[in-house]
């Protein structure tokens, strides 16, 4: 489970990246409204949900409580990359926003490389974009009993320098993942809050 908020390093957007961010409307463009993961980063950064890892001889399985997502990631080099997305929900719906992935070990670290993303958002709170040319690297290792992840987004059409995020996760002893069973969301609460604030200010 996520152990504290994720941290991000310097974000320097290109002109195109800045334009996409400027055009972003949380109440319209957030894929979460439709139970769609906006990006792998958005899934890692979600608090209070569980994640299960399973190592098989030829692949790594990552199951997320969030949106009931399941990632099947083959071990190997670039030739292991498949055309279809690596992530589905338990109903079998594919999510290209999470990309197509392959993985390898470098010492005690698992490196997951993902490509072929659908356009989405790394940070839905403020519309930090990813695009179809985006390549990501997730570096996972255990340190001091915690899972650490460094997540790097590379796309010179969107970022002047790679955008890097850091996460840490605490191990918990739990049984099977509960079902998330997402239903289409809305931001009625946001509108109601704004109406209340406007009334107070009048």
Where in this protein do the model-derived segments appear?
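PEST-like low-complexity, intrinsically disordered acidic/proline/serine-rich tracts
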Residues: 1-202
């Amino acid at each position: 489970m996520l152990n504290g908020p994720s941290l991000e390093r310097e974000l320097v957007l290109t002109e195109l990246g800045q334009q996409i961010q400027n055009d972003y409307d949380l109440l319209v463009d957030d894929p979460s409204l439709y139970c769609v993961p906006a990006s792998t980063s958005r899934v890692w950064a979600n608090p209070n949900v569980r994640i299960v890892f399973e190592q098989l001889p030829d692949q790594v399985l990552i199951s997320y409580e969030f949106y009931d997502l399941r990632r099947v990631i083959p071990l190997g080099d670039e030739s292991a990359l498949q055309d279809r997305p690596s992530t589905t929900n338990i109903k079998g719906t594919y999510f290209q926003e999470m990309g197509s992935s392959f993985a390898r070990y470098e010492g005690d670290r698992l490196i997951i490389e993902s490509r072929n993303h659908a356009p989405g958002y790394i940070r839905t709170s403020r519309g930090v974009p990813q695009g179809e040319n985006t390549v990501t690297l997730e570096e996972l290792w255990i340190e001091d009993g915690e899972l650490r992840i460094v997540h790097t987004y590379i796309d010179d059409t969107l970022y002047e320098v790679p955008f890097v995020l850091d996460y840490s996760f605490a191990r918990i002893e739990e049984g099977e993942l509960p079902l998330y069973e997402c239903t289409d969301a809305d931001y009625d609460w946001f509108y109601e809050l704004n109406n209340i604030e406007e009334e107070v200010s009048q």
